[in-house]
């Protein structure tokens, strides 16, 4: 018999406390719902979102060339990811106050509208604006899919179902790259975005029919769309966050006044903190719920997302420019990382479901392993590219092995390095989501899952943009130095028109515009610019390993003491 004193806790631990009767009733109802119709309704939209992301990664260089605005191609990727970042956490809160179905239909509307407008873009600016509208919806498609899975599954089941979800997501990424290549070289990229509109309309019909999840904390239908209820959505926090991230991107890529941009960025960040701390009633970033473990895992998530999206958007440009590989064949290179995302998600879900150790500690060990794989993949990729000359030359890795640009060996190593980065990312993603379900109250899971996707999206937009900006800035300065400042041993004289043609239209590089020896040296400048773009990613991956190791040790001590 247990002895009690005045310090004894008479209440059961939070995970053992009984839920209110109605909440428990709704929970049992949701668990009993037929899963396939719900998951199909959710995952079809998620599939489209993932398809869209790799389509753009593969075709953005060609689209920018078509508009003769290659120097702006980072905005094709960034505009979509920026709005995705800003609105994703709002969908978590929106689904908590209006229900999962209403939030999902809102996301589907913006995604379809963005795809439709993309078809009619006449320049990179219009293309980017349309992609931004599409990103508003895409953020919700992914976030609500993950949130709704937690409603109809137990915590341990969620790891497996999240693995299935990432298989669907990975399959979309797998098809996106080759489809983008085939379409842009046959019927054009406009049709590729146009055919997504009727598909997302079908998703809306399925959502209306199948998404019937009941939630205890959602107000009655007549109260959901009142001004008082909708005012709970933290729109000012979201807008100030967009302003902060946009300021960072403009600081890195714009020729505007750096002082004013820096002041704008700092001011926006201060406004965001003040709104989240003192103004917003229900925050997109609830500081009071941010435990040390969640903060560490969030930081690692940002880093991992930065690394993988930097790779996704750098890889096609490298293959197309330096190795002269077509858009269609570039898509084949991107298939393997997409497969690794699906496999990594499934394996992680299986491990978490069958582990005998503390579930949270197991999840954090997987996060640590995922970061190690990403650093190894980046290091291998950097080593390969630093020794592999563009397109035609010979590189002796070992005395018995010779690489040529048309050799299968460098391609296998390149794919393996990309697979390591993507596999590690998938493991980290599933493990972090499961740790949220295991450590957060049911009523806050939608919000905290939205916060998780906020961190992931911040990593996505910064990784894609800053990696491309690092490459573009390095290329601009190095080309200028080579063409006009460096003393060369040849007699060739460059013109500024040639310089700006290379910067604004990357197809100019492969045209008959330079003598062979000059062309070779220009390619070497491009190669050095690509290598420089690896450095921030490698440094961040190393930081991620340190943080995830601390996370493992922290949870191990906590689980041992308990």
Swiss-Prot record:
Residues 52-100, 153-166, 212-232, 277-292, 353-365, 441-448, 550-562 are cytoplasmic. Pfam families: MFS_1 (PF07690). GO terms for biological process: basic amino acid transport; transmembrane transport. GO terms for cellular component: fungal-type vacuole membrane. The keyword Membrane applies. It is a multi-pass membrane protein. One of its GO terms (molecular function) is basic amino acid transmembrane transporter activity. Residues 1-30, 122-131, 188-190, 254-255, 314-331, 387-419, 470-528 are vacuolar. The chain crosses the membrane at residues 31-51, 101-121, 132-152, 167-187, 191-211, 233-253, 256-276, 293-313, 332-352, 366-386, 420-440, 449-469, 529-549. It is found in: Vacuole membrane. Keywords: Amino-acid transport, Glycoprotein, Membrane, Transmembrane, Transmembrane helix, Transport, Vacuole. InterPro entries: MFS (IPR011701), MFS_dom (IPR020846), MFS_trans_sf (IPR036259). Glycans are attached at residues 123, 324, 504. Transporter required for vacuolar uptake of at least histidine and lysine. Belongs to the major facilitator superfamily. This is Vacuolar basic amino acid transporter 1. It comes from Saccharomyces cerevisiae (strain ATCC 204508 / S288c) (Baker's yeast). The lineage of its organism: Eukaryota, Fungi, Dikarya, Ascomycota, Saccharomycotina. The gene is VBA1.
């Amino acid at each position: 018999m247990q002895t009690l004193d005045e310090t004894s806790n008479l209440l059961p631990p939070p995970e053992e406390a009984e839920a209110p009767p109605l909440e428990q009733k709704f929970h049992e109802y949701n668990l009993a719902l037929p899963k396939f119709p719900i998951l199909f309704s959710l995952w079809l939209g998620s599939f489209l979102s993932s398809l869209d992301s790799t389509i753009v990664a593969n075709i953005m260089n060609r689209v920018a060339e078509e508009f003769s605005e290659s120097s702006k191609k980072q905005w094709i990727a960034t505009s979509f990811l920026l709005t995705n970042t800003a609105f994703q956490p709002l969908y978590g809160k929106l689904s908590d106050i209006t229900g999962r179905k209403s939030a999902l239909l809102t996301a589907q509307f913006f995604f379809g509208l963005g795809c439709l407008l993309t078809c009619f873009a006449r320049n990179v600016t219009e293309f980017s604006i349309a992609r931004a509208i599409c990103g508003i919806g895409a953020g919700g498609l992914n976030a609500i899919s993950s949130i709704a899975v937690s409603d109809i599954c137990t915590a341990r089941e969620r790891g497996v179902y999240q693995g299935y979800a990432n298989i669907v997501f990975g399959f979309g990424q797998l098809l996106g790259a080759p489809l983008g290549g085939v379409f842009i070289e046959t019927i054009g990229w406009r049709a590729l975005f146009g055919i997504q509109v009727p598909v997302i309309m079908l998703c809306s019909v399925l959502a209306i029919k199948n998404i019937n999840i009941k939630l205890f904390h959602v107000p009655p239908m007549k109260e959901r769309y009142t001004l008082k209820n909708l005012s709970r959505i933290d729109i000012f926090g979201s807008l100030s966050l967009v302003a902060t991230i946009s300021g960072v991107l403009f600081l890195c890529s714009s020729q505007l006044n750096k002082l004013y941009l820096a002041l704008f960025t700092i001011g926006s960040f201060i406004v965001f903190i003040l709104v989240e701390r003192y103004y917003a009633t229900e925050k997109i970033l609830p500081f009071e719920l941010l435990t040390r473990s969640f903060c560490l895992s969030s930081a690692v998530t940002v880093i991992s997302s930065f690394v993988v999206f930097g790779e996704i958007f750098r890889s096609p440009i490298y293959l197309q420019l330096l190795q002269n590989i077509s858009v269609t064949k570039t898509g084949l290179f991107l298939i393997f990382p997409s497969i690794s995302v699906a496999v990594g998600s499934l394996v992680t879900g299986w491990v978490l479901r069958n582990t005998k150790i503390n579930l949270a500690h197991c999840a954090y060990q997987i996060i640590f392993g995922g970061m190690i794989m990403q650093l190894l993949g980046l290091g291998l990729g950097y080593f390969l590219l630093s020794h592999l000359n563009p397109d035609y030359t010979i590189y002796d890795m070992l005395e018995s092995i010779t690489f040529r640009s048309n050799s299968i060996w460098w391609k296998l190593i390149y794919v393996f390095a990309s697979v390591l980065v993507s596999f590690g990312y998938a493991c980290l993603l599933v493990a972090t989501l499961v740790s949220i379900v295991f450590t957060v109250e049911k009523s806050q899971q939608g919000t905290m899952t939205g916060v998780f996707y906020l961190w992931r999206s911040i990593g996505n937009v910064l990784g894609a943009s800053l990696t491309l900006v690092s490459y573009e800035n390095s290329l601009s300065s190095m080309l200028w130095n080579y063409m006009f400042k460096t003393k060369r041993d040849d007699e060739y004289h460059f013109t500024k028109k040639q310089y700006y043609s290379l910067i604004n239209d990357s197809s100019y590089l492969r045209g008959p515009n330079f003598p062979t020896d000059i062309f070779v040296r220009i390619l070497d400048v491009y190669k050095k610019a690509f290598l420089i773009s690896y450095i921030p990613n490698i440094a961040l991956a190393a930081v991620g390993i340190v943080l995830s190791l601390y996370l493992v040790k922290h949870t191990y001590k906590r689980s041992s003491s308990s």
